[in-house]
């Protein structure tokens, strides 16, 4: 018997989250789950999914936002040892599978160079803080109150 609370899976990249996502997809039908991978209007997407009585499971690459923390949902994530996660992240971006990866990897010659990028440092902490970049954090007036 499934728990009646919604399940929110915060999929931090390079932490074996794809395995958990596949497990969720095999246990919840398409109508019961909502995947969110775009950050455009993220809080509104999350709010809509949390309020939809048919949605039982929400997952994607998004940070722990206040709308989630304030809900009654069960929140889960996976963490990975930080050095292994950074190396995996570097290897993934080294494949340069799209323009974003090409841009990011300009001038990056080694995993050590990659760790100097703000985007790769403390990524797991950033996901759980609710802010994926410093600019977003500094622009949030409520944080400083």
Predicted regions and their residues:
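Juxtamembrane luminal stem/stalk of type II transmembrane Golgi/ER carbohydrate-processing enzymes
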Residues: 1-5
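Short "repeat-start/strand-capping" segments in structured domains, especially the N-termini
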Residues: 6-7, 73
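PAPS-dependent sulfotransferase catalytic domain
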Residues: 40-77, 84-145
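N-terminal pre-catalytic "stem/leader" segment of glycosyltransferase-like enzymes
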Residues: 7-39
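Short hydrophobic beta-strand that contains or immediately precedes a catalytic carboxylate
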Residues: 9, 77-79
């Amino acid at each position: 018997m499934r728990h009646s609370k919604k399940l929110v899976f915060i999929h931090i990249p390079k932490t074996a989250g794809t395995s958990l996502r596949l497990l969720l997809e095999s246990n919840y039908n398409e109508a019961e789950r909502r995947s969110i991978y775009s950050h455009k209007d993220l809080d509104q997407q999350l709010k809509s999914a949390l309020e939809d009585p048919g949605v039982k499971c929400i997952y994607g690459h998004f940070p722990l936002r206040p709308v989630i923390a304030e809900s009654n949902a069960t929140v889960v994530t996976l963490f990975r040892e930080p050095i292994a996660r950074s190396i995996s992240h570097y290897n993934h971006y080294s494949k340069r599978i799209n323009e974003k990866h090409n841009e990011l990897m300009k001038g990056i010659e080694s995993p050590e160079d990659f760790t100097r990028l703000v985007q790769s440092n403390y990524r797991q902490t950033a996901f759980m803080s609710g802010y994926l970049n410093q600019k977003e954090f500094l622009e949030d007036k409520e944080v400083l109150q």
